[in-house]
Amino acid sequence: MKQYDVKISHVALRDMEQIYSYIADCLMEPDTAMGQYNRIAKAIQSLNILPERCALVESEPERTQGLRQMLVDNYSVFYIV
């Protein structure tokens, strides 16, 4: 089975850090924040195998460009294979 290299953009990392900070600081749930951060990171890393398993987005021109969406709990991960 083919494996892909997964590269996380600086913007995506910043978004993940902001999610963590909001849950940890605003909601005062640091353990929940770490769990959410880890679930998102694990889901992103899982794209190294079968990244086509998630659907293309419906909007254009993003669909034509190959943009896909993966849901992780209440969050969306957008990526291109």
Residue spans of the language-model regions?
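Basic, Lys/Arg-enriched alpha-helical interface segments
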Residues: 1-67
